[in-house]
Structures are given as structure tokens and as C-alpha cells.
A protein has these predicted regions:
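Extended, Lys/Arg-rich, non-catalytic nucleic-acid recognition/anchoring regions
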Residues: 1-235
Length: 235
């Protein structure tokens, strides 16, 4: 993952907590204040608003410091998390789940296949959000196999999914996700319709992209697929 800079005012809007930030073909989401740098950050006093919200004070977003021309003091930076974590190669269609363990400082996700010549991986177009504000990756393995009664063990591997789209097409209606292990496939057309995910048993896991699995809470909010660049994903 590379380091990028934004103005502090932009962290209020348009890149506030939960907003998607696209840069150089990568997609990130701004983490909440629980991930901010401890006691750092200028305290701001707005007494009337503090009273209205029943809080003690406000804090300005922290700004990072550089040790030198190459090293950045992460203690002061505002964290962003890669989101969505499901990516695909535009050349071969290979899908890959890019979790934290795969992140390397100042490196971008690339396709490992020789014929793709280190092609940068592209984030999937759709993500999932519930009516109570939780945002997650869509479980594409579940989506692909939702019409099948069983799957083999190979279907559970991250490297068995493939994103297919007709040449020169930018419409979701012409795109499919397929499993190389068992041959199952399903079109993305209609995925953003109400009940499209809940009707096949996909539920909210009650956490945000920057939270670990042990932070999951029980949530009965109805989930829906939304394009990651859509304004209603944030506002």
C-alpha cells in the first residue's frame, strides 16, 4: 500500500469517516476515530455544539510528520483501509482477496500470472452495506455458488473466482463472476436490487472494513449491494 496525502479539511468532507477514496486505480475507505493516533490532534472548543451533542470537546484530524524524505511517521497519520478487498485482473479476470497479510509498504496489488505482466489489480465495482451503516465486501464465493446445493473444497480458495465482462462494456448487466473449480457462474445483473443479497442468505456481519473479525456485533440490518463510488454509500 502506498502513502498518499490529502488536505486536513478534506478529511471532514469529502473524505470523512466511511468515505471511499480513489487514487491511481486503488480504492480506500477512511477509518473511524478509534483508529486515530491516540492523544494527538488539536483540541477544538465549540461549547454550544458540545452541549447539544453531549460531548467534552472536538479534535482536529492529525497530520503526519516525515522523519526524512523516505520515511513517514505513521503515529500521526489518519488510517485508510483498502476497500473493497476483492480485486480482479482486467487481463485474465482472476479475482483475489487482498487482505492485510498481503499488504506491503509502497507496493500495489498486481496479478501474478506471467501473461498479465504485473497488471495492477482493479477493485470490484460493488460492495455491500446495511441499513444500519455497516459496510462490507460482498461474499462473491457465496454469490457464485448460491444456486448450487454443494461445492468442493477447491471452491473455498480465494484464487478460484474469475470476473468476466464483455469487451468494451462498462455495464454490470454484461458481467459475471465464475468459479473455475466447479464451473458455477452468476451474472452481476440485478445484484443491486432490493432483497438480491438477503434472498440468497447473505447477512450483515455487523462490522466495518477497518475492524477485525472479533469486533463483529449482531446486526439484523437488511443488506444491499451498492456501487462503491455511489454517493448514497457515504451520505
Amino acid at each position: 500500500m502506498e502513502y498518499k496525502t490529502i488536505r486536513r479539511s478534506q478529511y471532514i468532507s469529502p473524505f470523512g469517516v466511511g468515505a471511499i477514496y480513489d487514487f491511481s486505480g486503488e480504492s480506500m475507505i477512511a477509518a473511524d476515530i478509534n483508529k486515530w493516533a491516540g492523544d494527538y490532534g488539536e483540541i477544538l472548543r465549540l461549547k454550544r455544539l458540545e452541549s447539544r451533542l453531549n460531548i467534552k470537546y472536538f479534535k482536529a484530524p492529525t497530520t503526519y510528520n516525515k522523519f526524512n524524505s523516505t520515511r513517514i511517521n505513521m503515529k500521526y497519520s489518519i488510517p485508510f483501509e483498502r476497500f473493497p478487498k476483492w480485486l480482479f485482473c482486467k487481463i485474465c479476470g482472476q479475482m483475489e482477496y487482498w487482505g492485510r497479510a498481503k499488504e506491503i509498504e509502497n507496493k500495489i496489488p498486481m496479478c501474478k500470472k506471467e501473461k498479465c505482466n504485473n497488471k495492477k489489480l482493479t477493485p470490484m465495482r460493488f460492495v455491500m452495506a446495511c441499513e444500519k451503516g455497516h459496510i462490507e465486501d460482498i461474499d462473491w464465493r457465496y454469490w457464485v455458488h448460491s444456486h448450487k446445493t454443494s461445492t468442493n473444497d477447491a471452491c473455498k480458495l480465494d484464487n478460484q473466482l474469475e470476473f468476466k465482462s464483455k469487451e468494451n462494456s462498462s455495464g454490470a448487466a454484461l458481467a459475471t463472476v465464475a468459479c473455475r473449480a466447479c464451473g458455477a457462474s452468476r451474472a452481476i445483473k440485478g445484484i443491486s436490487q432490493k432483497k438480491a443479497l438477503t434472498s440468497i442468505g447473505i447477512k450483515c456481519r455487523g462490522r466495518q472494513p477497518w475492524e477485525r473479525a472479533d469486533k463483529e456485533v449482531k446486526c439484523d440490518g437488511e443488506v444491499r449491494a451498492i456501487q462503491r463510488g455511489a454517493s448514497n454509500l457515504y451520505y
